């Protein structure tokens, strides 16, 4: 089962843009605050967020590198900090990689990942259709079926804006995602009321009066809602 979150928007030359559009060489690319109707959809998986589709097409690896989007740069969305970057898949075909790990965790269904006829750049040079096919192209290569599927990796929440009692939050970690009203917070736990979402593993547990307690150490990211 995949959990999807809408977070942030794509900007081209500082203008909010739709996703799945053709890139014009030379445009400045960034991911920033969400604009209604132009939000990016992300799959919550393995303590990170991976775009559920290519958000730009006909873009080269060199174009992405010129915008510091290959190996990662820091962005702030909704008061929280992330590194936005390409996925890591390893230099050899049989090496463990983040894409395979994501497919193993939530499944390969095209309705989740929109991978059919939509290849994407990764950090490493590779060696085509199943969801796990990989190949290689020169860094300057551009094609309408080859695009930019970013990943967001949450940074340490201790350096983010203060979270206050009474705020409506969405918290995620692993494959778990929950939202609710923050009732209590400590160095070790958060307690939410009026919550909904999906719990897996040791992320959290249900307590009295329809509340849940979340292990602070299991939280990978947060969003005010």
Regions found by a protein language model. Name each.
Residues 1-52:
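GGW-centered surface loops in extracellular recognition modules
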Residues 1-12, 55-57, 69-188, 194-197, ...:
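C-terminal, surface-exposed recognition/capping segments
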Residues 31-42, 181-184, 194, 219:
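A structural signal for short, hydrophobic beta-strand segments that form beta-sheets
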Residues 39-42, 161-163, 181-185, 204-205, ...:
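Short, exposed beta-strand/loop patches in secreted or surface proteins that constitute
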Residues 44-48, 52-66:
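Aromatic- and glycine-enriched beta-alpha-beta binding-site module
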Residues 50, 172-179, 211-216:
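Short coil-to-beta-strand transition motifs
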Residues 59-71, 207-210:
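Extended Gly/Ser/Thr-rich low-complexity repeat segments
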Residues 199-225:
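Intrinsically disordered, low-complexity, charged/polar segments
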């Amino acid at each position: 089962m995949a959990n999807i979150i809408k977070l942030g928007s794509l900007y081209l030359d500082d203008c909010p843009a739709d996703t799945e559009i053709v890139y014009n060489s030379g445009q400045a690319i960034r991911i920033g605050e969400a604009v209604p109707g132009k939000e990016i959809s992300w799959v919550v998986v393995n303590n990170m967020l991976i775009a559920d589709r290519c958000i730009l097409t006909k873009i080269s690896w060199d174009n992405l590198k010129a915008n510091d989007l290959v190996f990662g740069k820091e962005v702030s969305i909704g008061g929280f900090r992330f590194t936005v970057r390409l996925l890591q898949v390893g230099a050899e075909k049989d090496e463990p990689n983040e894409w395979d790990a994501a497919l193993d965790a939530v499944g390969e269904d095209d309705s989740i990942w929109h991978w059919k006829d939509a290849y994407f750049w990764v950090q490493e040079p590779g060696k085509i259709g199943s969801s796990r096919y990989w190949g290689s192209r020169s860094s300057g290569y551009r094609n309408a079926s080859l695009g930019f599927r970013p990943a967001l990796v949450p940074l340490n929440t201790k350096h983010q804006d203060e979270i206050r009692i009474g705020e409506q939050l969405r918290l995620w970690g692993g494959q778990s995602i929950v939202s609710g009203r923050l009732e209590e917070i400590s160095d070790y736990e958060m307690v939410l009321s009026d919550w909904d979402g999906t719990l897996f593993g040791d992320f959290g547990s249900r307590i009295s009066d329809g509340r849940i307690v979340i292990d602070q150490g299991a939280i990978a990211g947060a969003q005010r809602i």
